[in-house]
Amino acid sequence: MPELKTVGLFLITALAEIAGCYLAYLWLREDKTIWLLVPCALSLVAFVWLLSLHPTAAGRVYAAYGGVYIVMAILWLWVVNGIRPTTWDLVGSAIALLGMAIIMFAPRTT
């Protein structure tokens, strides 16, 4: 069950990062209100705090988190931007998740 908790934490962490970056994007590129920077900052602070909750060495967390981030970004592309992922987007996401699983859940002594 710790694996499920780890993956869930990665998903929430990725959502916080992507949402924060997207809010900044809306302000910078879509000419939306500067007030979007308030939830943007809160989201990015939550992202950093969530990263600190992961139960392994920071470098390993960052490496594995990248795989989950890719999947969440493709999901964001579909849900928020309304662009359906291609087969290659899905294949690449699956490979990234496999890499995350190997990094996080492989047996090790340290």
UniProtKB/Swiss-Prot annotation:
Transmembrane helix is among the record's keywords: yes
Source domain of life: Bacteria
A cellular component annotation (GO) from this entry: plasma membrane
Stored InterPro entries: UPF0060
TM spans (from-to): 7-27, 33-53, 63-83, 87-107
Record-linked PANTHER family: UPF0060 MEMBRANE PROTEIN YNFA (PTHR36116:SF1)
This protein's name: UPF0060 membrane protein Noc_2955
